[in-house]
C-alpha cells in the first residue's frame, strides 16, 4: 500500500499539486456531453443516464479536467469511471478507492476492475487504485484530493457502522476547501432514520447532520437526481426498484415506470 501512496504522490507532483482546492468552480454540464457519447461507455451504463444525470451531477460537484478526484467504491461496473478517467487522464488524476482482495466477498468484483484497467490502457492506464475497507482507508495522500465522490454508499455505511471512519478518511484526503459530493437514496421525513435504514433510504436532514459532525460544511444541494414517483414503501426496500428489481418479475412494469430511486445530491466542503 505504501507503494501505491508513493505512486499517487509522484503523480500529484507531476500535476503541480498545490495545497488548497478551488471551491466548486462553475462547470457547464455541456462539458461532459462528449464523454457521455463516447464509445468507451458500456450500454448498460448508458441506459441508466436518464436516472443518474451524470453531466449535471459532475458539473454540480465542480470537477475540472485538472482535478484530483477520488471515487469511493466504483466497482467493476465503473459507471462514473468510464466518464471521469478519460476526462482526467491528461491533466488530472482519477483514483478508484475500492474494496480490495483482503475481503473475500468483494474479491471477484475487484479483480474484474483491475482486469478492466489492464485491458484498456489507453483509457485507464493512469487510473490509481487504492484501498477502502471498514478498518483501513488509505484512499489518497493527506490533503491531496480536490474532490471525493460517493454514490449510493452512505446507507450501507450507516447500516454497517462504517460511516465515522469513512468520513474521517474523506476529510483527511481532501485539500482545504476540497469538495465532498454525496448522492444517495432519499428517505421519508415521516419516519425516523432507524425505521428506514434497512430499506436503503437515508433522510436528507440526517445525512447532512452526520456529515457536518465530521467537520464538513454543506455548500449546496441539488434536485437533479430527484424522483417524485418513488413512494419509498416497498417490500424489498429501495432494491425493489431498477436496476436491482429484487422482486424479479412481480410488478416489474410498475417498478420500471417508477424508475430508479429518489436521490439527494449534496455538496460539502472541507473547512
Where are each of the predicted segments found?
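Class I SAM-dependent methyltransferase Rossmann-like catalytic core
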Residues: 32-60, 64
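Conserved class I S-adenosyl-L-methionine
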Residues: 65-76
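A short glycine-rich, Lys/Arg-flanked "PGG" loop and its adjoining helix->strand segment in the class I
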Residues: 85-86, 163-176
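Conserved Class I S-adenosyl-L-methionine
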Residues: 193-219
Amino acid at each position: 500500500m505504501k507503494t501505491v501512496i508513493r505512486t499517487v504522490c509522484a503523480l500529484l507532483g507531476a500535476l503541480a499539486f498545490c495545497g488548497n482546492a478551488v471551491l466548486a468552480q462553475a462547470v457547464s454540464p455541456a462539458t461532459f456531453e462528449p464523454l457521455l457519447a463516447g464509445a468507451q461507455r458500456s450500454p448498460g451504463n448508458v441506459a441508466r443516464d436518464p436516472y443518474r444525470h451524470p453531466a449535471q451531477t459532475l458539473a454540480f460537484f465542480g470537477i475540472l479536467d485538472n482535478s484530483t478526484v477520488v471515487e469511493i467504491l466504483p466497482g467493476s461496473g465503473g459507471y462514473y469511471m468510464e466518464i471521469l478517467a478519460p476526462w482526467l487522464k491528461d491533466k488530472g488524476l482519477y483514483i478508484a478507492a475500492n474494496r480490495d482482495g483482503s475481503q473475500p466477498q468483494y474479491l471477484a468484483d475487484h479483480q474484474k476492475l483491475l482486469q478492466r484497467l489492464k485491458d484498456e490502457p489507453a483509457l485507464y492506464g493512469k487510473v490509481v487504485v487504492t484501498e477502502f475497507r471498514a478498518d483501513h482507508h488509505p484512499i489518497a495522500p493527506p490533503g491531496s484530493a480536490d474532490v471525493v465522490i460517493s454514490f449510493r454508499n452512505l446507507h450501507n455505511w450507516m447500516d454497517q457502522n462504517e460511516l465515522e471512519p469513512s468520513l474521517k478518511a474523506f476529510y483527511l484526503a481532501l485539500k482545504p476547501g476540497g469538495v465532498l459530493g454525496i448522492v444517495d437514496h432519499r428517505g421519508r421525513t415521516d419516519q425516523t432514520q432507524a425505521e428506514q435504514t434497512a430499506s436503503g433510504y437515508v433522510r436528507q436532514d440526517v445525512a447532512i447532520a452526520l456529515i457536518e459532525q465530521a467537520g464538513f460544511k454543506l455548500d449546496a444541494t441539488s434536485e437533479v437526481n430527484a424522483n417524485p414517483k418513488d413512494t419509498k414503501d416497498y417490500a424489498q426496500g429501495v432494491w425493489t426498484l431498477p436496476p436491482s428489481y429484487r422482486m424479479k418479475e412481480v410488478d416489474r412494469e410498475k417498478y420500471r415506470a417508477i424508475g430508479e430511486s429518489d436521490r439527494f445530491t449534496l455538496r460539502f466542503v472541507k473547512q
